[in-house]
Structure formats: structure tokens, C-alpha cells
Design a protein with these regions (language model features):
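Helix-to-loop junction immediately C-terminal to a conserved catalytic motif
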Residues: 22
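H-loop (His-switch) and adjacent beta-strand-loop-beta switch element
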Residues: 168-184
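Helix N-cap at the start of a conserved alpha-helix in ABC-type nucleotide-binding domains
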Residues: 135-137
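ABC ATPase C-loop
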Residues: 116-117
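Conserved ABC ATPase signature
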Residues: 99-103, 107
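Conserved catalytic motifs of ABC-family nucleotide-binding domains
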Residues: 120
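Conserved ABC ATPase "signature" region
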Residues: 77-95
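Catalytic Walker B motif of ABC-type/P-loop ATPase nucleotide-binding domains
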Residues: 124-128
């Protein structure tokens, strides 16, 4: 299992590619082939989830079980165990009864990632998971993602964080909806390649 990062300026197609991989955006051409029994878990940008949603942290994480149960069926004991495990894994069990809108940026991002974990997929898609977070929150999420990969989860994340990108196993460099580079981060994220992508904005 591995971590793949999608790197590129705003508007380069990172979020669109994640949406296609998640199955929420239909590709305009080509065919997407996936293996595995479960659909990927998709964690959107924090800004895509409204601050005013009247949800507790636990309720938000429980939404990760909807793919298994549907939004109207009662959660089973196993569902509750899965949700508890996701809350504990992200270190937010003590925040379970808090409203999402009351959380700090880092806490809220961990709640969204916990929702992704509750889906029990072997593919986790993350859109800018550390954008706008302080160093401590970024490091905590980075450590968590490393641990998930060690446990057999494949992680694909869009990021502007070049330090995090250089620590990944593979990198896709995007520009204007096109792939301009792929491979190991040290091969793709060269000074000349980054300069070319960002100077042509």
C-alpha cells in the first residue's frame, strides 16, 4: 500500500480527479477501473462541509456508515463499534458529543477523516486535508496517514504542501486539467517542473 499525492496550482484539476476516483464526478472520456469490494472513502475539503450543520462529531462520523446501511436504517452494534474505533483512532472520542461548528480546524479535519475511516475502505481519498491547519495539526494528520498506509490503506491526497508531497510514495503533477508529471516525488517535484507549472498561471 502507498501514498500518492496530487500536486498542482488552484484550478489544475486535483479536486476533479479525486471526484472522478470517488465516483462523484463522471469522467468526460476514458474508463475508470477499480478493484476491491468496497468503494473508496472520500474526505472533501473542510470548506465543503458547512460550519452551521447541526451535527455532533459522532453523528458526522456515523454518516460514514451510510454506504453500508443507508441513511435511514438504524446502525447495528458493529456499526457503533466501527464508529467508536474511528473516533479513537483520530483521538477525538472525547469530542463525540460536541457540535462540528464548535471545533478547531484541526479537530474538525480529524472528524472528517474519522468519517472516512468509518467507511472501512482500503482506498482513502483526501482533498487538501491539512490546508489552513497549524503545524501541530498537520503533523498529527501526517502521522495518522502514515499509520493507515502501514495498516494496508492506500491514500491519495491532493495537497499544496510540498513537504508532505515529497514524503509520499508517488506523485502526480497537474496543470490545467492535464497530467504533466508522474513518478517518485524526487523525480517529479523538481525546481524546473514546479517553476514551469506555477509560472504559466
Amino acid at each position: 500500500m502507498a501514498t500518492t499525492v496530487l500536486v498542482g496550482p488552484n484550478g489544475s484539476g486535483k479536486s476533479t480527479l479525486l471526484g472522478v476516483l470517488a465516483g462523484v464526478i463522471k469522467p468526460t472520456s476514458g474508463v475508470l477501473v477499480r478493484t476491491g469490494d468496497r468503494p473508496p472513502a472520500f474526505v472533501p475539503q473542510r470548506g465543503a462541509v458547512g460550519d452551521t450543520l447541526p451535527l455532533t462529531v459522532r453523528q458526522a462520523v456515523e454518516m460514514g456508515r451510510w454506504g453500508e446501511r443507508g441513511p435511514w436504517r438504524r446502525l447495528t452494534r458493529r456499526d457503533h463499534t466501527t464508529v467508536d474505533a474511528a473516533l479513537d483512532r483520530l483521538g477525538i472520542g472525547a469530542l463525540a458529543s460536541r457540535q462540528l461548528g464548535e471545533l478547531s480546524g484541526g479537530q474538525r479535519q480529524r472528524a472528517l477523516i474519522a468519517q472516512g475511516l468509518a467507511q472501512e475502505s482500503d482506498l482513502l481519498l483526501l482533498d487538501e486535508p491539512t490546508t489552513g491547519l497549524d503545524i501541530e495539526a498537520r503533523e498529527r494528520i501526517g502521522e495518522l496517514l502514515t499509520a493507515l498506509v502501514a495498516d494496508g490503506v492506500t491514500v491519495v491526497q491532493a495537497t499544496h504542501d510540498l513537504e508532505a508531497a515529497r514524503a509520499a510514495d508517488a506523485c502526480l503533477l497537474l496543470q490545467n486539467g492535464r497530467l504533466t508529471g508522474q513518478g517518485r516525488p524526487e523525480q517529479v517535484l523538481t525546481t524546473s517542473a514546479l517553476t514551469q507549472v506555477w509560472q504559466t498561471l
